């Protein structure tokens, strides 16, 4: 298992700019203007006292440390210590009275435990370490006595408690920690037995098919292997393939609005599911070393993640759609299976506030996992612009990655080691990469990585170069998408942003944290006229996934086609066009990265069969 560098890794280049945008948007301001964080019961207030503040801190803490921003750091520390200061004498930490514990969903205990452990990874804070120990020991004692047990959310997210237990056990192993882990597993849901419920979508809300539960669930075996020492069985790989077959999307996620929704290109995927799927892939790669999890992570991170935010990250969606031609509130019944008709709007709290609280972990945790420490050296797991300092066998080592990946196919990696230390540097190479070269020479790639074992002396730089070709990918609908490297491309639709300012249930929406409907002002009904795909590079903008100035585009020949609306809706296209016969002239049009396109057509018909 690898080691995350936490306080010793810092972002640079486009990744730092993305994190700065995030800090200037909702993530860095929720505690100032959103009642469920600002006035939370976790701090003695009268608002929500369950998952929302812990969710926010789970992303806000690493964001503050990655940017090394004094104001953000002070606010994160203030929240953590306000929570710890309210811990009860027996160790119970959640904001509820003693006589309410039996009916308090223990998901919040597991979540705050994970957050306190994360804080302690960055800060040598004995008060919080002690509070975390007492929190988990209290949970053990209450569960062992039968005074509390897992139900509802806690039952379906039991494995999240292993994160805090692992943190404690690595520092001070005690038998009760393993015992608590076993109780969580025994009382938790058995996901392998639930697959018959995943075969087809149902317009019914239930925990067993809840998309966020399932995206979290896919790491449970990795966590069990890391904590209990279990032998891997591949069960979560099998569960992934089951979900992918019946509910997979073109951008590596699964549909769920809010429960499993099939392979339709107009069903939604919840933002919480996006960030939790990223976190799952990070854990699975860290524990297994299997590159497929890193591939999956990048597909989600560089496509689904940026697509569901406004460029300034003040607004987000609850649900995103692969073919998304309008984000307008449905006047009658919702198109989504259990979510309401405003779930695809961009704003402060569309549909429900869980994503407002939980969206913050995506970019920061990706940055933390870019460079990882292994038993015999270092691993560049993701070609992201970062620098890190650590020790290998007691000797100081610095490493820096300079790159504009995923918009470019090259990276410069510099290692500084002035004591002549021999160690292994592993460079993960994406599975799609062709003609992989190191310093101009053809590189040997084995099991998805280049492995360099040598004595590093002074400052040494490596130039890693890759190539890729844009290509079509066939979807279950029979339509095609375009991919280039890890990026999926879409036809952007010209958009009018219609601002909505209002107050609902005591929560004010006003600029910049207002809501937006997105109105299409150009046609969207096109198909691919031939196989021509030409990649064009552009400067990487100050907004890396800019909707106005994308860093890479693909020119394609498209033709208009008769494409009706979904029955009962006039802002949702049917899954497929009515015909494969063009109804107009072929046009040279520009596709942009899916993550840059807020209104878009991604799955389109190939109007002429092409041999691939």
Where are each of the predicted segments found?
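Catalytic-core region of carbohydrate-active enzymes that cleave or remodel glycosidic bonds
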Residues: 223-246, 265-314, 324-325
